[in-house]
């Protein structure tokens, strides 16, 4: 259960400000480590600032979600959600300048398949990469090399509670105990869209899965012109607890605001930041702590098998929708 889980105890935070402090601290610690090795000065322009790291994390997180969306065989949503949560957690306490998000995102997806018992072999997994057989072999080597590191940085807290199960539970409850809404299934598509959008925000690190699921349903109802506050007050028995009801409504409002204010990284900004990132990981600087024993990816041209022709803003190394 979520309320007795490591997710609640260790990976659910009080505010966006707390998340920002953790990320800034990870950035500062890496800079101190890099300066200590004598290869760079404290104010060297090679360093990424915390807000630049966050932009890159957003970019690679979106690519992770898109990679999972075109994965063959189809990847269950719970696996996608788990991979996304691993990625968010990892970069709360680590810098992209030390561990490249390109390989971390794949390692997150690979580990999520194992933990959620999605039966995919290693060759099947890397077979989803737009790479030659040799490139796929190298990718698998790096994934396996980073897997233990990822597990350690997650503090061995591998069970993730996603909002998808409580979402289905709420729909069943509405069908059973809320006759005012004749066909709750009409809410599903818009609610699914909301869950997809909120996965790109920090909501998974701030709110409970059931709060996210309920917000998705009520947001969908609101967009359809359906008022469901009586479901909260009557069916969920919050009528007598106005304080709890008010707090829940505030939480849902905060989540909707997270979705509204989310801005995807601009392609021109990402291009500049990726150049800085590759500079941090170049062999002459060697800022990253993990010694690369094997050759890994030298670019991002690996994420699916067919380029998406209709989106001109994507370059040929971007994640694409295929099939």
UniProtKB/Swiss-Prot annotation:
Residues 310-323 have a biased composition (Acidic residues). Pfam families: Cyclin_C_2 (PF16899), Cyclin_N (PF00134). GO terms for molecular function: cyclin-dependent protein serine/threonine kinase activity; cyclin-dependent protein serine/threonine kinase regulator activity; kinase activity; RNA polymerase II general transcription initiation factor activity. Keywords: Cell cycle, Cyclin, Nucleus, Phosphoprotein, Transcription, Transcription regulation. GO terms for cellular component: CAK-ERCC2 complex; cyclin-dependent protein kinase holoenzyme complex; male germ cell nucleus; transcription factor TFIIH core complex; transcription factor TFIIH holo complex; transcription factor TFIIK complex. The modification Phosphoserine is found at residues 5, 132, 304, 322. Regulates CDK7, the catalytic subunit of the CDK-activating kinase (CAK) enzymatic complex. CAK activates the cyclin-associated kinases CDK1, CDK2, CDK4 and CDK6 by threonine phosphorylation. CAK complexed to the core-TFIIH basal transcription factor activates RNA polymerase II by serine phosphorylation of the repetitive C-terminal domain (CTD) of its large subunit (POLR2A), allowing its escape from the promoter and elongation of the transcripts. Involved in cell cycle control and in RNA transcription by RNA polymerase II. Its expression and activity are constant throughout the cell cycle. Belongs to the cyclin family. Cyclin C subfamily. This is Cyclin-H. It comes from Mus musculus (Mouse).
């Amino acid at each position: 259960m979520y309320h007795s889980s490591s997710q609640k105890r260790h990976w659910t935070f009080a505010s966006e400000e707390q998340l920002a402090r953790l990320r800034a601290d990870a950035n500062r610690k890496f800079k101190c480590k890099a300066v200590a090795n004598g290869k760079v000065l404290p104010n060297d322009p090679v360093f990424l600032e915390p807000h630049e790291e966050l932009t890159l994390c957003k970019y690679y997180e979106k690519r992770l979600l898109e990679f999972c969306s075109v994965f063959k065989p189809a990847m269950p949503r719970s696996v996608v959600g788990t991979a996304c949560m691993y990625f968010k957690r990892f970069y709360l306490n680590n810098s992209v300048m030390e561990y490249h998000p390109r390989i971390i995102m794949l390692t997150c997806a690979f580990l999520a398949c194992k933990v959620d018992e999605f039966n995919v072999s290693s060759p099947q997994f890397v077979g989803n990469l737009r790479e030659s057989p040799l490139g796929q072999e190298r990718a698998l080597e790096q994934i396996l090399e980073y897997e233990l590191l990822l597990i350690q940085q997650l503090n061995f807290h591998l069970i993730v509670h996603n909002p998808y199960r409580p979402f289905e539970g709420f729909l069943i409850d509405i069908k059973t105990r809320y006759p005012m809404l004749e066909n709750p299934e009409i809410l599903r598509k818009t609610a699914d869209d909301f869950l997809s959008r909120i996965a790109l925000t920090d909501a998974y690190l701030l709110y409970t899965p059931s709060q996210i699921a309920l917000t998705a349903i009520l947001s969908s109802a609101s967009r359809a012109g359906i008022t469901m506050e009586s479901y909260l007050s009557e069916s969920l028995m919050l009528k007598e607890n106005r304080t709890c009801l008010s707090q829940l409504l505030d939480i849902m409002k905060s989540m909707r605001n997270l979705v509204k204010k989310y801005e995807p990284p601009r392609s021109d900004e990402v291009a500049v930041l990726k150049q800085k990132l590759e500079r941090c990981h170049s062999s002459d600087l060697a800022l990253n702590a993990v010694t690369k024993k094997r050759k890994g990816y030298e670019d991002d041209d690996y994420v699916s098998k067919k380029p998406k022709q209709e989106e001109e803003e994507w370059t040929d190394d971007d994640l694409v929708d295929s099939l």
